Amino acid sequence: MCLQHGLSVQKCAMAQQRIIDNTRMYFIASPYEEKNLNHHAYSYKDTGILKMTGIGRYDGLVNNDQKQILITPTWRMYNAMPVTTSEGEQRSYNPEFKTTVYYRIYNDLINNQKLIETAKRTGYAIKYLLHPILSAQVDDYTPDPYVEVISSVGDMSYEKILTESSLMVTDYSGVQFDFAYMKKPLVYFHPDELPAHYDDGGFFYDTMGFGEICTTSDMLVDTLCEYMENGCKMKPKYIERVDDFYHYDDHNNCQRIYDEIMKFQQQVDRDKLRK
């Protein structure tokens, strides 16, 4: 049974494939996941394995806005050390990290005085959350004292920081889908100097993304300041995209997953009796 930590809307057949994984049930939240996973590379089409239930952890995503801006980009293969433990966990410290364009762009952002002064004046905190794989680099950042840089390991709660944030800035991180589920505004930062993290799959940011796409730091800061000046409300255009993307938004996902598992187990039991 597959309970994903993210949504399968990008090309990921190298990591997920029914025959290799021996998957019997795959729980999904969006018709766009279903469309992507029905590609022949995954071997799910016409198997009945894909179950449109919603994602269980989304049941706990209830908005608890504490007036904070969350900046949380994903990682890049070239700025992390090779994997030595489980994939997805914090990797060893990379002594070359501070020489990367990735570091320069984001360290500059968390020192941008226009952004910080607007946040102060409008009453928003700013938090920069590292991807778990890059959390060993936390002390490399030199933020303005107003900005809190957070390592996403240990007792850090994603649910807490997502529900308490007013707006999210990300590039390609899968937590965008958690945040959008609460219909809170997102802004994408896709600087030309940084290559995309994923190949195109079933999610296209220009037509399906849940917020504006900014390609320069100045554009990003201007957009964030505008949102803060106007109370950080998701725009109707993007609310429509959220409604189109998710099959359910009723916080009953765990119950549907449980029901599907019980149906599967009952069928297994019946099959045993026939033998």
Segments (PLM) and residue ranges:
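C-terminal alpha-helical cap of glycosyltransferases
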Residues: 250-275
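Conserved catalytic-core segment of nucleotide-activated headgroup transferases in glycan assembly
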Residues: 51, 56-142, 214, 249, ...
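Active-site and donor-binding regions of nucleotide-sugar-utilizing enzymes
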Residues: 1-60
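Catalytic binding pocket for nucleotide-activated donors in carbohydrate/polymer assembly enzymes
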Residues: 46-47, 140-145, 174-246
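Donor nucleotide-activated moiety binding/catalytic core segment of transferases
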Residues: 132-177
